[in-house]
Every structure is written in structure tokens, then in C-alpha cells.
Amino acid sequence: MKKFFSILSFALIFVSCENDIKTNTPAFQGEKDNVLWKANEARVTVNNDGTITLNGYTDFEVVSVRVPNAVGKYDLGTTDGGVFASYSYTNSGSVYYYETIGQIGPTNKVSLVDGGSGYASLNGAIVQTTGGTGNGLQLKLTVLPNGKVTGAKITSKGIDYSPGDIITAVGGNNDATFEIVNTASSNGEVEIQKIENGTFTGTVKFNATDDNGNVLNFNKGVFYKVPVY
């Protein structure tokens, strides 16, 4: 019975938050370092290079996201410097700034480049990798019966990798390759779910760093019907 009420309470809270966003249009909110963050004002700017910039403002803060002007999912902290998220805070004349620029560090996400061949016996196996600027990255492979790798899960993040590094899964014919998408201290994802009547709706989450390597987390971000200005 207690479990039932806990699930029911969670569901009611979720519905309440969703309704709060939809009844306060436009809306942009999330959790900054596990504390609720809500913009007083939100707007979208359409840029000449085919991207948009979404800004959410409080009295002293700005959360900014720059992504292509199209429905889709976009990784942050990659080699593409034109796609990023940032957070700035102004206090007594000082500005504290965090951004999802590419950072050297433990791997956060990989993307398959070439499935290679000869890996049939390694489906579900954890393998070492070679290449890139770092070391220690291990992957659990998903492999077709014909020996072609179709994906992998990171089991050990390693150290000192850079976005854009190409690494090779050891085994088979040693020809299955992956790209390091982003690293642990600077990463994230923006999803534009809907563009409708000059407004944008979607989700955002990211880890961003300042010049000293300090990390800021922005999670559970939702923007709803934010208009173009």
C-alpha cells in the first residue's frame, strides 16, 4: 500500500509540473546543480548560419543553448563549436561563465564509425580499445552473427580522451572503430521536439565547465512554446 501511494504521489507531482509548464507559456525551467531553476523570461533568436539561440533569463542568470534550427537531437561538448550550451551568473560586477566546450577527460559517449568484421564471438563481451589521446576505455560490444559490430556500451570511461578521437575495439579483425563524442566534464543533449507557429518546444540537459575546470550541471530542462524575437 505504501508503495502504491508513493507511485501515485510521484505521478501527481509529475503531472503538476507538466501542467505548470504548459499553463505558463512560454516556459523554460530545469534543475541547476539539483536545485529548481526557472526562467523569468525566455526567447529564441534565429541566426543567419541556420542555428537558433534559446535564452532563459532570471534577474542575474542566463542559460543559453545554440543548436540547428530543426527538429532533432543534438549532442553538446563535441568538436562542433557552433552547437553548445552555457550558463552565466552576474554577482557584484563579476561574471561567472560555464560552457560545453570540448574537454579532455573520461569518455562520456561514443558513436560507431565502422562496424568492422570478425567480432561474432564477442557479442556481449567487454573489450579493450586502442587509439585516441587517452587510455583505459573499455566497451561492451553488440555484434551481429556475421561479426559486424552494431553498438557498444561504455563499461570503463578511461582518462584523457578528447572529443573527435577515433578508437578501435580490440578483437575480431581489429577494424571496428568508434568516435569519442564528448567527455565527462562537458557534455549534454538538446532535443527540439516541435517547431510550431514561431515557437520552440523541447528538452535540454548538460554539464558545462568554467575556465578553472569547475563543472555545473543543468538537468531535466524543459522549454515549452518559447517564441522567436
Language-model segment annotations:
Residues 5-7, 11-39:
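Bacterial Sec-dependent N-terminal signal peptides
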Residues 29, 53, 64, 109, ...:
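Beta-strand secondary-structure signal
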Residues 36-47, 139-143, 159, 189-195:
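Short, exposed beta-strand/loop patches in secreted or surface proteins that constitute
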Residues 45-104, 184-196:
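Surface-exposed helix/loop patches within compact recognition domains
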Residues 55-70, 134-136, 159-162, 174-177, ...:
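Short, surface-exposed beta-strand/loop "edge" segments at domain boundaries and coil↔beta transitions
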Residues 103-184, 202:
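Conserved, function-critical positions that sit in or immediately flank catalytic
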Residues 177-187, 203-229:
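Edge beta-strand at a domain terminus
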Residues 191-200, 227-229:
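A short, structured loop/turn motif at beta-sheet edges
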